[in-house]
């Protein structure tokens, strides 16, 4: 018989740096999950993606065990890394803060493909381009 699910928790955590401090501790604590167990597993699985924010969906079962699924980093985080900037523009339609190449957009789209509801890489590229536009990043090429 399958375990009964009692909760789904969605968090965005820095790769390899999950600690029992908020937001992890309170979110898992209210469901009675072993917080240190989650932190160690998460950090072990994300150690190669250092410096990125990783969304994670944690499923908590009735016997207080858990499983989690790692998602791809948000498009905005990948775009900021590709452009080499700390944050997007406050007024994206007036102030452009950086440029990325079409090749970089394609690479990000291919990375995000598993989490996007796009049927092709071209469609995913348009989604990423829209995110870039709303951040004040121009696309060359």
Curated annotation (Swiss-Prot):
Keywords: Methylation, Ribonucleoprotein, Ribosomal protein, RNA-binding, rRNA-binding. One of its GO terms (cellular component) is cytosolic large ribosomal subunit. SMART domains: RL11. The keyword Magnesium does not apply. PROSITE patterns: RIBOSOMAL_L11 (PS00359). GO terms for molecular function: large ribosomal subunit rRNA binding; structural constituent of ribosome. One of its GO terms (biological process) is translation. InterPro entries: Ribosomal_uL11 (IPR000911), Ribosomal_uL11_bac-typ (IPR006519), Ribosomal_uL11_C (IPR020783), Ribosomal_uL11_C_sf (IPR036769), Ribosomal_uL11_CS (IPR020785), Ribosomal_uL11_N (IPR020784), Ribosomal_uL11_N_sf (IPR036796). One or more lysine residues are methylated. Signal peptide: none annotated. PANTHER family: 60S RIBOSOMAL PROTEIN L12, LARGE RIBOSOMAL SUBUNIT PROTEIN UL11M. Forms part of the ribosomal stalk which helps the ribosome interact with GTP-bound translation factors. Belongs to the universal ribosomal protein uL11 family. HAMAP family: Ribosomal_uL11 (MF_00736). Part of the ribosomal stalk of the 50S ribosomal subunit. Interacts with L10 and the large rRNA to form the base of the stalk. L10 forms an elongated spine to which L12 dimers bind in a sequential fashion forming a multimeric L10(L12)X complex. This is Large ribosomal subunit protein uL11.
